[in-house]
Structures are given as structure tokens and as C-alpha cells.
């Protein structure tokens, strides 16, 4: 959400409300609590790739906001197809058990594209900073899905961080209307 807020300010001259900024900080605190245990080990390469992915996602939201007439379904379908074509070659489904394969197929074939379609459509009605507030909920949901599907019990920090994330997103998106700046982007 931080990158989406900054980029929408730079590219679209959209302001982010103080309430949304507070929610962003609180949400990021929850994410740090969730991943805090894994931050101590490993190299920086994975962190840099994750940071790059977050920045590309923010750029994506800003582009959707700037161009509300882009055909959402077509663009999401084309990008999903390209993603499939790029990843199908190196993938080896025989390395996954049946549950993992079904979960992967469900995510890539249904949940991922539907989520991207919803996100891209939401930018017609809300600034990228607010739309991106929903993405940290995916981190919480992923932990729950792994718990339900694979019986991998999340750490206590995951529950605490997840509660912080959900409460922060709820706080950021349910405030009084005067605290939300619904100003639409200026067309180029």
C-alpha cells in the first residue's frame, strides 16, 4: 500500500487520506509480526524480488486507475495466459502431492484471475492506496489456507499479526466519508 500511495500521488496527483496512511502503517506492522521470524535468516535476494513484485503491483494499480476504460477481463485473461505459458515449461506437477496440485490449479486458474479482475475493477472506484489495502489480507488468508488444507499450524505470531492486519484494513476502509479522499484521477 505504501508504494501505491506514493505512486498515485506522483502519477495521478491523488492524495491519500490520513486515515489510510495510519491503516497502511498498522497493516505493515502486522505483516512484520507475521514474517518477523523468517526475516532473520537467508539472503537479501528473495527480499529484493519481493520488493520488486510489490512495486510492480503498485504500478499496475496506478495504470488501471489512470486508464479506467481498459478492458479488465481481456487484459487479465491475456496476462494469466502469458503467466501460464511462461511457468508451465519449468513446472513439474509430479513433484506435488494431489492436495498441493489442486491448490495450485485453483489459485492459478480461478482465485488469482478473479482477484486480479476485482482489484483492477476496484481502481475505477477507489484510489490505488485504498485498493491495495486488501492485498495484505492475502498474507493472512494464505496462512489460514495452509492450516486448513495441509494441517500446518501457524505460529502464534502469525495469529497476532493476522489480527493486526485484518483490524487495520477494517479501520482503513470503514471510516467516516469525510476522512476518505475519493477524488478521481485527472485524465491525461
What is each model feature region?
Residues 4-6, 39-94, 104, 183-188:
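Transmembrane alpha-helical segments that form core, pore/gating elements
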Residues 124, 178-186:
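Short, Lys/Arg-enriched, Gly/Pro-containing loop segments at transmembrane-helix junctions
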Residues 64-82, 113-148:
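Helix-helix packing/entry segments at the starts of transmembrane helices
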Residues 12-17, 71-72, 127-128, 150-154:
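A helix-boundary/kink motif common to multi-pass secondary transporters
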Residues 7, 16-36, 53-57, 81-87, ...:
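Hydrophobic transmembrane alpha-helices of multi-pass small-molecule transport proteins
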Residues 2-16, 58-70, 116-123, 173:
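C-terminal ends of transmembrane helices
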Amino acid at each position: 500500500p505504501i508504494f501505491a500511495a506514493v505512486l498515485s500521488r506522483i502519477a495521478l496527483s491523488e492524495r491519500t487520506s490520513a486515515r489510510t496512511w495510519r491503516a497502511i502503517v498498522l497493516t505493515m506492522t502486522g505483516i512484520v509480526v507475521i514474517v518477523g521470524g523468517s526475516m532473520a535468516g537467508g539472503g537479501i535476494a528473495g527480499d529484493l524480488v519481493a520488493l520488486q513484485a510489490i512495486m510492480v503491483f503498485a504500478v499496475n494499480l496506478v495504470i488501471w486507475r489512470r486508464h479506467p476504460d481498459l478492458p479488465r477481463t481481456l487484459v487479465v485473461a491475456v496476462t494469466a495466459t502469458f503467466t501460464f505459458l511462461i511457468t508451465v515449461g519449468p513446472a513439474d506437477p509430479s513433484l506435488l502431492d494431489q492436495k498441493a496440485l489442486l491448490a495450485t490449479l485453483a489459485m492459478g486458474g480461478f482465485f488469482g484471475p478473479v482477484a486480479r479482475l476485482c482489484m483492477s475493477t476496484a481502481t475505477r472506484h477507489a484510489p490505488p492506496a485504498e485498493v491495495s489495502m486488501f492485498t495484505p489480507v492475502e498474507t493472512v488468508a494464505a496462512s489460514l489456507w495452509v492450516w486448513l488444507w495441509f494441517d500446518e499450524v501457524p505460529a502464534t505470531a502469525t495469529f497476532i499479526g493476522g489480527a493486526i492486519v485484518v483490524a487495520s484494513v477494517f479501520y482503513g476502509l470503514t471510516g467516516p466519508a469525510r476522512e476518505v479522499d475519493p477524488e478521481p484521477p485527472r485524465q491525461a
